[in-house]
Amino acid sequence: LGPDSVPLSRSVLGLPPRSCLICGENAKACARNRTHSMELVRWRTAQILNDYFKEQSADQAAAAAVRALLYEVSATPKPGLVDRNNSGSHQDMDFFTFVDSSSALIPWFRDFFSIGWEHGDETGDRLFERLRFAGQNAEAKMFSATGGVNTHKGLIFASAILCGALGKVYKDAFLLGKKPPVPLDAVVGECKKLGSCSLKDFKAEDRRQDVSAGAGRRRSTEETAGERIHTAYGIAGARG
């Protein structure tokens, strides 16, 4: 209202007409002419709310994840490990290498959460593959930030599963109208489902080993350290 109690229009204030949420045109004209159906208006409203709460929750998840990384490397002393005082047995990295890596991973923690939110209704295998692909891109950013040093590869794997599971559970709670925090057992249950998908890698590797052995070929040099340990000792490592 103005000093004379007369409502002030947007044009008087030098502002453009309010945009329609559906088409972007003049909202008043769309409302007056009933340009859009009520079903479309409700759908768009739900989409706006979904996007808002997804982005807000993804930011919170990413902040918590990077805070955990910084707390871990800051814990001192940690004999044999990187801390604020020394590099322990890791001569190719130091405290600041971890800080650089942690900073580079922030957007990927958001991405993991968003993947779980947006694709939580897919099968566990398909959701896991989406998270794996994003995790591989996150690894590339980590190596770029650290000059080729592996500071958080295992953590990326674990956080992709955790943040992805968290995103799925948050979306389910949002659809039911439930407020955070979400049940811990629900998040742990989703982590277990996604983690079990990764164990299929070992089964595929075992089959490759059998074929190679039968053909008299040597084992592939492209195995990861985890795959080599599994082949030698049957230990599942991060996947288990």
Language model: regions and residue ranges:
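Long, contiguous binding/interaction regions
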Residues: G2-S9, L13-K54
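Short, well-ordered, mixed-charge alpha-helical segments that flank or form enzyme active sites
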Residues: D4-L8, A29-R32, F157-A158, A165-G167, ...
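Short, amphipathic alpha-helical segments
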Residues: L13-P17, E39, Q136, V149, ...
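Histidine-centered, metal-coordinating catalytic motifs and their short helical/loop contexts
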Residues: G24, E139, G195-S196
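Glycine- and acidic
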Residues: A27-C30, S87, D121, F143-A145
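Phosphate-rich cofactor/ligand-interacting catalytic cores and adjacent structured alpha/beta frameworks
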Residues: Q47-D121, F128, L166-G240
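Long, hydrophobic/aromatic-enriched structural stretches that serve as scaffold segments
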Residues: R110-K168
